[in-house]
Amino acid sequence: MKKILLTGFVPFLDNPINPTEEIVQGLHKKSVNGWEVVGEVLPVDFHVTGDHLVELIHKVQPSAIISLGLAAGRNRITPERIAINCNDGPVDNQGYKPDGEKIISDGPDGYFSSLPIKKMVKELENNGIPAKISNTAGAYLCNHVMYRALHEIEQQKLDIFSGFIHIPASHKLALTNNIPSFAQKDLQRAIEICIGCLD
């Protein structure tokens, strides 16, 4: 059975939970549409997260990678189109604040997702789940891991589909914030649908 590496993140900033962590834990070792899910929760740390992801790619040897991130405030599932070679944003969980430096000093300006993002959006909408392609993954850890995975695949000429999907807040996370939210089970179902779009 083909393997898919599914990653999420631990809680960060002022978020007490991270629904991507729950999705990854919920799908770990499960079979989804012929794919064996290998789930991994990543730290929110600019200095170690990218290297850890690269190590996982070579250890797991997946045929596909979907990385997940929380975009609290968005009101739909948003597969990302592009990752840019830039670290920026608020502090990570170790207190480090990037200031626009490159992720890879001699790397290209950006990489496009190799996931079937249009198909994913269509299938999500066909299942009654709001979805839209996003043209910016930001410059925080979400963009960082998307870029690092795609860069490693390009440099090593690996035959791996890879990309990133941002999800809205879960209801539990929205209890203390006035933001759009989904039921956790619907967020997980959305990712299962996205996995089902892979050939």
Swiss-Prot record:
Catalytic activity: Release of an N-terminal pyroglutamyl group from a polypeptide, the second amino acid generally not being Pro
Keyword annotations: Cytoplasm, Hydrolase, Protease, Thiol protease
CC annotations in GO: cytosol
InterPro entries reported for this sequence: Peptidase_C15, Peptidase_C15-like, Peptidase_C15-like_sf, PGP-I_bact-type, PGPEP1_Cys_AS, PGPEP1_Glu_AS
One GO-annotated biological process of the protein: proteolysis
GO MF terms, alphabetically ordered: pyroglutamyl-peptidase activity
Subcellular location: Cytoplasm
Active-site residues, Swiss-Prot/TrEMBL: E80, C142, H166
EC number, as in UniProt: 3.4.19.3
Subunit (UniProt): Homotetramer.
Function as written in the Swiss-Prot or TrEMBL entry: Removes 5-oxoproline from various penultimate amino acid residues except L-proline.
Similarity comment: family membership: Belongs to the peptidase C15 family.
The protein, known as: Pyrrolidone-carboxylate peptidase
Species of the source: Oceanobacillus iheyensis (strain DSM 14371 / CIP 107618 / JCM 11309 / KCTC 3954 / HTE831)
Organism lineage: Bacteria, Bacillati, Bacillota, Bacilli, Bacillales
Gene: pcp
